[in-house]
Regions:
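Non-heme di-metal
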Residues: 1-208
Length: 208
């Protein structure tokens, strides 16, 4: 079902450490709109999708988010692996260093640890897919913010641009999945029932 290729989706080769920028990018590792939450969200939601197409989209994107997680963690690692103690102290990286040295650990740019309350798996395909559309836009916005900071550093900006572009593609794929779910609904009111749980004909046809 799945094949792991031992290479990054996009090459990363950062030669100059930068502790301050690493803290910004770290947010896409374990922040509120980061890749850990995205992968867990989609891989959890896939089980209650009402058709194979929507389930496959969630599975494909959820596993790709794991590849993006690998990319973001590689960027953070390369930005911090050769830091001197002077750089750590001057950059404000000290509190992170005390707890994790230069290990990669999931937290937001502000230092808030990752937690699963930052994503949902509601069991309602329409609800979940709308959440996913919003999640991809929030991730794109975060990458936009990062790009404003690193725009003049090509070795960082180039892989970030790649990640941003994939968020746009994911948004489009989730739109396709949402349409496939809505087209299967009998009611023009998409919120009349949960197609993964309720039976819309239960009251009238007694066949469910």
């Amino acid at each position: 079902m799945w094949n792991y290729e031992k290479r990054l989706q996009y090459p990363i080769n950062i030669k100059t450490p930068n502790a301050k920028i690493s803290q910004f990018i770290m947010s896409q590792y374990g922040g509120p709109d980061g890749e850990i939450g995205a992968s867990l969200r989609y891989l959890s939601q896939r089980f209650t999708m009402p058709n194979r197409m929507a389930s496959a989209v969630l599975n494909d994107i959820g596993t790709e988010e794991l590849a993006h997680l690998e990319m973001v963690s590689t960027i953070v690692h390369q930005l911090t692996r050769d830091l001197s103690m002077e750089e750590i102290e001057k950059s404000g990286f000290g509190p992170y260093y005390i707890d994790h040295t230069v290990g990669v650990w999931p937290q937001a740019a502000g230092g808030v640890p990752f937690n699963a309350c930052e994503f949902q798996s509601k069991g309602d395909p329409v609800t979940d897919l709308f959440e996913n559309l919003a999640a991809e836009q929030k991730a794109r916005s975060t990458y936009d913010n990062i790009l404003r900071v690193v725009r003049n550093i090509p070795e960082i900006a180039d892989p970030i641009r790649f990640l941003r572009a994939r968020e746009v593609v994911h948004f489009q794929r989730f739109g396709e999945a949402l349409r496939s779910v809505q087209e299967q609904l009998d009611s023009k009111n998409f919120y009349a029932f949960n197609p993964s749980f309720d039976c819309p004909c239960e009251a009238s046809c007694k066949k469910c």
